[in-house]
């Protein structure tokens, strides 16, 4: 297969460029990350992130033939012979396929991604019924790969103001958690023209999520909570 890979080293390159690599790979059970590792063996100057190789850590997210995804779970057999790889859009490029995730994680941390409960700690865990626990399905599985937020035009335009699909999915994860006591505080923080309401239900986030999650649905639930509180 042939990989056209975005290359950019700010220490020596005046501007980015694309470079082609030929890789011989048995496509039967191989993933795109395997091809990238082979490219790295040919040219050790190329840079990309990787870790778990199992679609759990989210570190090898990149733009694959114009669509964000994880290289480690993208089957070579499902790809054309010519594959174009670029860094995730909308974030500053550090080098080659590595982007600066600072703004993404700044927005994530801004929603206070942890249970806030001021009751005295129980002897064991804070209890939930099976039904209450099921409300978190489709929310907690997010691996923070940033595929969704970097596919969102609203995040491209206002990354410093709009929380983004990933952050808002996690915001609703804690709003939906019956153990959390900070509902009013969380809604006050999100009731803003930019932080929440820059979402225009374009739904690119749903299309690219490698875990099959639905950030748009979670965002709409937050909007519903704000409307119910207002009336």
Protein language model annotation of sequence segments:
Residues 19-30:
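Short, contiguous acidic and Ser/Thr-rich linear segments
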Residues 75-76:
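A generic structural motif
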Residues 1-21:
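Eukaryote-biased recognition of intrinsically disordered, low-complexity regulatory segments
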Residues 43-49:
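Active-site phosphate-binding and catalytic loops of NTP-dependent enzymes
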Residues 52-61:
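Short, structured protein-protein interaction patches enriched in aromatics and acidic/basic residues
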Residues 29-43, 86-231:
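Ferredoxin-type iron-sulfur electron-transfer modules in oxidoreductases and energy-metabolism complexes
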Residues 24, 63-67:
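Short strand-turn-strand beta-turns centered on an Asx-Gly dipeptide
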């Amino acid at each position: 297969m042939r990989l056209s890979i975005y290359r950019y080293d700010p220490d020596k390159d005046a501007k980015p460029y694309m470079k082609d690599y030929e890789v011989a790979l048995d496509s039967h059970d191989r993933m795109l990350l395997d091809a990238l590792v082979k490219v790295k063996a040919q040219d050790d100057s190329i840079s990309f992130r990787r870790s778990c190789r199992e679609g759990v850590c989210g570190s090898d997210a990149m733009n694959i033939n114009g669509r964000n995804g994880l290289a480690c779970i993208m089957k070579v057999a499902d790809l054309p012979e010519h594959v174009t790889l670029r860094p995730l859009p909308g974030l500053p490029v550090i080098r080659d396929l590595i982007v600066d995730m600072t703004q993404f994680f700044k927005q994530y941390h801004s929603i206070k991604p942890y249970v806030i409960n001021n009751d005295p700690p129980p002897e064991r865990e804070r209890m939930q019924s099976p039904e209450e626990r099921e409300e978190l399905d489709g929310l907690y599985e997010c691996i923070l790969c940033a595929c969704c937020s970097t596919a969102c035009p609203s995040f491209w335009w206002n990354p410093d103001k709009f929380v983004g699909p990933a952050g808002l999915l996690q915001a609703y994860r804690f709003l939906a958690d019956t153990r959390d006591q900070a509902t009013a505080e969380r809604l006050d923080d999100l009731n803003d023209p930019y932080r929440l309401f820059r979402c225009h239900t374009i739904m690119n986030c749903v299309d690219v999520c490698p875990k099959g999650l639905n950030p748009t649905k979670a965002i709409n639930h937050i909007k519903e909570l704000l409307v119910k509180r207002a009336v």
